[in-house]
């Protein structure tokens, strides 16, 4: 059984359709320039107009309105800076905190040299890199979660 069916050009009905410009070689208007120059920009501008219209008609409030006369108890950075903030907060010396943050990329640059004898790309066959990645991910999550707690509960995450 064939997957493709070839047209029977000896069929008079098919030959009549092909003579009129109908059939497998006629699909309507060409994509260039009609669709690409006229229809697509209209769709894109319509989408942008819809998004802007929804943003103007129903603006989403982000958090509570700012009160310039009330200072918050603790000012926190954006969520993606929580681990860095926690390192600076828990280390007693600020220079030590900056040195620890500079040591992280330097340590990551050493991993390929430590594991240079292993040429595999599969992470399960590269135990040193996988171990560093897993420990680094867990420590980063732990530091990020601890940044939202008060300083006395930040290292234990309020569990102990």
Curated annotation (Swiss-Prot):
<keyword id="KW-0472">Membrane</keyword>
<dbReference type="GO" id="GO:0045158">
    <property type="term" value="F:electron transporter, transferring electrons within cytochrome b6/f complex of photosystem II activity"/>
</dbReference>
<keyword id="KW-0249">Electron transport</keyword>
<dbReference type="GO" id="GO:0016491">
    <property type="term" value="F:oxidoreductase activity"/>
</dbReference>
<keyword id="KW-1133">Transmembrane helix</keyword>
<feature type="transmembrane region" description="Helical">
    <location>
        <begin position="131"/>
        <end position="151"/>
    </location>
</feature>
<comment type="function">
    <text>Component of the cytochrome b6-f complex, which mediates electron transfer between photosystem II (PSII) and photosystem I (PSI), cyclic electron flow around PSI, and state transitions.</text>
</comment>
<protein>
    <recommendedName>
        <fullName>Cytochrome b6-f complex subunit 4</fullName>
    </recommendedName>
</protein>
<dbReference type="GO" id="GO:0045156">
    <property type="term" value="F:electron transporter, transferring electrons within the cyclic electron transport pathway of photosynthesis activity"/>
</dbReference>
<dbReference type="Pfam" id="PF00032">
    <property type="entry name" value="Cytochrom_B_C"/>
</dbReference>
<dbReference type="InterPro" id="IPR048260">
    <property type="entry name" value="Cytochrome_b_C_euk/bac"/>
</dbReference>
<feature type="transmembrane region" description="Helical">
    <location>
        <begin position="95"/>
        <end position="115"/>
    </location>
</feature>
<comment type="similarity">
    <text>Belongs to the cytochrome b family. PetD subfamily.</text>
</comment>
<dbReference type="GO" id="GO:0009767">
    <property type="term" value="P:photosynthetic electron transport chain"/>
</dbReference>
<dbReference type="InterPro" id="IPR036150">
    <property type="entry name" value="Cyt_b/b6_C_sf"/>
</dbReference>
<dbReference type="InterPro" id="IPR005798">
    <property type="entry name" value="Cyt_b/b6_C"/>
</dbReference>
<feature type="transmembrane region" description="Helical">
    <location>
        <begin position="36"/>
        <end position="56"/>
    </location>
</feature>
<dbReference type="GO" id="GO:0031676">
    <property type="term" value="C:plasma membrane-derived thylakoid membrane"/>
</dbReference>
<keyword id="KW-0813">Transport</keyword>
<keyword id="KW-0793">Thylakoid</keyword>
<keyword id="KW-0602">Photosynthesis</keyword>
<dbReference type="InterPro" id="IPR005870">
    <property type="entry name" value="Cyt_b6/f_cplx_suIV"/>
</dbReference>
<comment type="subunit">
    <text>The 4 large subunits of the cytochrome b6-f complex are cytochrome b6, subunit IV (17 kDa polypeptide, PetD), cytochrome f and the Rieske protein, while the 4 small subunits are PetG, PetL, PetM and PetN. The complex functions as a dimer.</text>
</comment>
<keyword id="KW-0812">Transmembrane</keyword>
């Amino acid at each position: 059984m064939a997957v493709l069916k070839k047209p029977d050009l000896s069929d008079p009905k098919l030959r009549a359709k092909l003579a009129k410009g109908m059939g497998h070689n006629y699909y309507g208007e060409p994509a260039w320039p009609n669709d690409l120059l006229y229809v697509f920009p209209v769709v894109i501008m319509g989408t942008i107009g819809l998004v802007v219209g929804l943003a103007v008609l129903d603006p989403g409030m982000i958090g509570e309105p700012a009160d310039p006369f009330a200072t918050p108890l603790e000012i926190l950075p954006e969520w993606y800076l929580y681990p860095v903030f926690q390192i600076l907060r828990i280390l007693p010396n600020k220079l030590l905190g900056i040195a620890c943050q500079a040591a992280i990329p330097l340590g990551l640059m050493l991993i390929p040299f430590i594991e240079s004898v292993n040429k595999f790309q599969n992470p399960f066959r590269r135990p040193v890199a996988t171990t560093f990645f897993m420990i680094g991910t867990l420590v980063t999550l732990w530091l990020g979660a601890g940044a939202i707690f008060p300083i006395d509960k930040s290292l234990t995450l309020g569990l102990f």
